[in-house]
């Protein structure tokens, strides 16, 4: 399959825009000057998180919420199926 030059050019431009936005976000000061609340106003907050790290076809799922971990496992299974479909050249029509 031959790539059209315009698609290659657009891909490169999008990568440069992404790098520029990340760099700009790190350089510009944040809108919050004081990151810590005063001692009297500190409250406990429960943040739930979960994530997936793919090392090749092997997923590593982490998190602190059982519900989000199950969702992450399901997403990891879908990602593995997606990778195998592309690796073996199976086309969905």
UniProtKB/Swiss-Prot annotation:
Entry-linked InterPro entries: DUF131 (IPR002849)
Transmembrane portions of the chain: 7-27, 70-90
Chief location bin: membrane
Keywords: Cell membrane, Membrane, Transmembrane, Transmembrane helix
UniProt topology in membrane: Multi-pass membrane protein
One cellular component term from this protein's GO annotations in UniProt: plasma membrane
Intracellular or extracellular location(s): Cell membrane
Name of this chain's protein: Uncharacterized protein MJ1617
């Amino acid at each position: 399959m031959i790539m059209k030059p315009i698609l290659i050019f657009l891909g490169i431009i999008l990568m440069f825009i992404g790098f520029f936005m990340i760099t700009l976000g790190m350089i510009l000061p944040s809108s919050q000057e004081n990151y810590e609340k005063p001692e009297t106003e500190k409250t406990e907050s429960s943040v739930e998180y979960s994530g997936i790290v793919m090392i090749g076809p092997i997923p590593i799922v982490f998190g602190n919420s059982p519900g989000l971990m199950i969702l992450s496992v399901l997403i990891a299974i879908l990602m593995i199926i997606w990778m195998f479909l592309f690796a073996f050249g199976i086309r969905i029509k």
